[in-house]
Amino acid sequence: LAAPNVVNVSVQSLVLIADGWFVGRLGTAELAALALVFPAQTTLQMMSAGAMGGGVASSVARALGSDDRGKAEDAAAHALAIAAAMTVLFAIVFVGFGRPLFGALGGSGAALEGAVAFSTVMFLGCGAHWLANTLASILRGTGDMHSPGVALITMAILQIPLSGALTLGWAGFPNLGVAGPAAAAVIS
């Protein structure tokens, strides 16, 4: 049961390494920008997949285990509503207050500007993360570990070349610079 999740976490680690490599080609200020946003990005991932994901899967599984399909459907609907609310909250915090937050972490100059550019794209589009991780958790709660694992792994594998293309302007893609990995994460 754990194999798809182990592979998913491993592939997600490769995504972070690839993003660092692509952004490192842009320069040290851009790499510092990525480092400034990393705690916020990790919080998004841990909240949408870990904290909420575990609760959603557990809630759906318990309802189905007690043969209460209506309760399972209610749990899934509530999970999607919470994900929508968290999307708005994360966007307000990290887009609306990104500059002072990243400045408080020591960001200044080009690194701060890059962090703001990255976080604006990432957190305006973070609904994609919340939706994907919430739907994956609902499926896990039904006992289907395979489908969400394959979907999340596929998305991560697609994210790597897309990140390079959008960060460095490969193959006619727009060169978004430090915002490229954020755009790739939202799209994939």
Where does each model-flagged region fall?
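Short alpha-helical transmembrane segments in multi-pass integral membrane proteins
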Residues: L1-N5, V60-G127, L158-P161, A165-S188
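Short hydrophobic/small-residue motifs within alpha-helical transmembrane segments
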Residues: S10, C126-W130, T154
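Interfacial/gating helices of multi-pass transporter permease domains
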Residues: V23-T42, A110-A117, V178-A183
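Small-residue-rich hydrophobic transmembrane alpha-helices
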Residues: L31-I92, H129-G143, S147-P148
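Alpha-helical transmembrane segments of multipass membrane proteins
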Residues: I17-W21, T43, I92, P100, ...
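Residue-level signal for short hydrophobic patches within transmembrane helices
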Residues: L1-L14, A18-D19, A40, L44, ...
